[in-house]
Amino acid sequence: MDTPLRGRRAAGRGVRARARPRTRRRHRNDHPLLAGRRYLRDDRVRLQDARKPPARARVPQLRGRDFALRRADRRVEHVPLRGRHPRVRRVPQRDQDGAPRRRHLLRRRVGGHRGRNRHAGDRRAPGVDSRLRQQHQHPRGRHASDRVQDGAHPRRQRLREQPRHAGRPRRRQPPRRGRSRGTHRRHLRQAPRPAVRGPDEDQAREFRGPRHRRERHPPTARDVLRGEPGHGDGHHLEGRRGRPRPQGREAGRGAHPPQVRARIYLAAGEARGLPEPRPLGVRTVHRGGRLRGRVGQAGPRPQVPGDFAPQGEDSERRETPPRPHSRKRRDTGAHHRHWRRRRRRVRHREGALPAAHPDDRRRRRRRAHPDAAAYASVPAHAPAHRGRLRVRGSTAAVPRPLPRQHLRRDGRGRAGPHHRGGMQRQPHAGPAVQGTR
C-alpha cells in the first residue's frame, strides 16, 4: 500500500473520531437505579460499572407474582395445583375443528363459548403417545376409556398447600343411606324418641292394634265407673242413622225387656189397607195398579180357581190344532232384498221395453224417443206408422250388403262375368223401417 494512501486513511479516522465522540460508555449507568430488570438473576444483582448510588436509589424487590412463578417451576409433590394434573398439561390449540360451529354461535349468541353441546376434538397431552378423543359434555371432563383428565382449568387458580392432616390415614366411613330432604334440600326434623322401643310397639315404633294407630298420642289411663264399660252396647244409640232416635239406656245387670212378635212386612200396594188372606208377594198388577185394557184379560175372571194362564194365552180358550189359513209369523228384522221391492219398478226375466215406452227403467218419467228427427237412421215418414198396431216379435231383417270386390284402377273387378261391366247393385226393396229393440 502506498505511503500517501496510508496517511490519508489515518487522517480520516482521526477526523471521524473527533466529530462523533463515544457516548455509549458515558450514558451506560445514568439510570437512577443501579441496575434494571435484565440484570436480576435469582436473588443476586449483577452490577456493571458500579458507582455511588443517589440518595433515594434502592435495589428492585421481587413481588408476589415473581415468587409464584418461581414456586410453580419447582417440582415438589406437596405443592399441587388446583385443577391441574402434574403430568398432563392443557394444549392451547385443537388439532381438529378448532373454530366453533355456526349453529352453536346462533344458539348461544356468544363468540367463543363452548357449553354442554360442544363438538368433539382431538387433544394432545405430553407424556401420552396416543391422542385422546375428547367428547364430553363438560369442559373439564374425562376420557371414558383412558380415564385421563382433560387438563387444568383455563382460568387462573391460586396455589394452595395441603392441610396438615393430609399425610395421616383417613378413616373409611361405612356407606350411609341418603337422608330424606325437605324444601331447599334441608334436613327433615324428627321427634325425639327413646333408643329402646316399648312392649306395645312394633318395628316401626307404632303401637299395635287399629285403635292405637288411629290415635296420635299413646292412651292414658282414665277413671271408669264400676258397671259402665268403656266401649259397650250403651255407647251406641238405638235406631237407624239419620233419623231421630230415643236415647239409649245403659247396659247394666238388670233384666232385658221381653221379646216382641216379629214384624210382618206387607206388599207395597197394601200398606194402607188390611192384609188379605193370600200368600205373600202374589199380586195381579205391579205395585197394586188398576187393570187396564193392555194388562187385564177380556171378560170376567174364571169362577173355578186354578193356576194362572201362561203369558200370551187365554185361560177361557182351549188348545186347538193350527188352522190352515193362519199366517205364519216371520222375522220382522229380516232383509228380503229384491222380492220385497216395488213390483212396478222391478221386472224379473222380462224382455226389452219398446222404444216409445214411458218407463225407461231409470226412475225418470219421460219418453225414450221424444223426437224422432234427432236420429239419422229413422226416415221422416217413420212417425206416421207409429199409430198402427204393433206386432211383438223379432227385429226385421236388414238387407245383406254385397261383398267388396278387388277393384282395379280401370274400375273393373276380378269377380265373375256378371260383374265385369262394373260394380252393380240390386234395387232397394223399400224404405228402411225401425223395428222393436
From Swiss-Prot:
Residues 1-31, 77-437 are annotated as: Disordered. Residues 119-132, 143-164, 198-209, 217-253 have a biased composition (Basic and acidic residues). It comes from the Archaea. Residues 1-29, 81-91, 101-118, 133-142, 165-190, 284-293, 324-348 have a biased composition (Basic residues). The lineage of its organism: Archaea, Methanobacteriati, Methanobacteriota, Stenosarchaea group, Halobacteria. This is Uncharacterized 50.6 kDa protein in the 5'region of gyrA and gyrB. Residues 371-382 have a biased composition (Low complexity).
